[in-house]
């Protein structure tokens, strides 16, 4: 009965059926959260775990059918490794190796040349959860002084039970599209600690509805505008025949609206977590915070003229996971740049095996490097600082935003088109303008520094 209805809905909306199933599965998290609040909040932990497991498995079955066994196998193996290997480096390395190899094998055997919603999509979220679980269990055996603040907060004092591991993995608010959260936070949710009124369900309905409304607005924008900017048009002769400026503006608008696909899912899923209580983040300046599961800072995403600002506003929990479990654990390298490169390399492999991911993340690293040098130049140059603080700044801001979104869309081309032949065709059609722009900027910034920064300031900077 459901299949024909979904088929008709898919046809009427002009969206693939797997995408319809996915968004419905994210939305059904709201009634699941209400069931938990109304009927299960005061129930024993075992009942809550079973509810999370059954609801998550139901979502997996609805979207991927019998392929849900992939997640079940990985969760069970992870539990066995925690139990049998204990708090050891071997346990962490075994978990990391097994979970990543399973994910990469999934990518390899299900790979196509287009973006498909298949079991590997939620599995990449699960992979980070389970690797993070191994790290957090290992950290629980260390002295707090050996850990960073966020690592100490997530460290597990004891091995979790089988029900805890499965409930944590299949929690309906984060199983399909994230966000990432720790086992400690999940345990606090089940023990009724994540609430603004102790002993009662949290007053989180209004904050959850606000995120739902914002997410739905982003989803509507994606549904309205994305059909006008399809990925496939980038590969057509018609696109190649357009003027250069048109091709660039198309990439700008395409990249902007394409990202709403991710923004909408993450913000709606965040609302589910808030409604259940998992989004509770304590009190700051007398106000209860509900941003523990925030994966997007939408206002910053929309208004920042900086590439670094967009990265800071986008996929926040995944970036925080990478910082906590990869970047900060590479201190032994003694070089932040090397740690940054290694972290980006991990995220590249985690996303998939296509060449487009490598190019996208390498471009991100290069763009951020150039932007930081440009920011330092503006801060050190009296002329540029005065210009940035003058009445001309609104004009400068508009130019910044154009450059920012043009070259945000530019590295997204290989990210979305995946294969060498496709992204090379698009980059050739715009004469590799993004590569050339940032290469030229990288080469001339040292000379601009000599020209625009007083010698005294340059000497002081060198000494620092």
Segments (PLM) and residue ranges:
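Non-catalytic, membrane-anchoring transmembrane segments at the edges
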Residues: 1-464
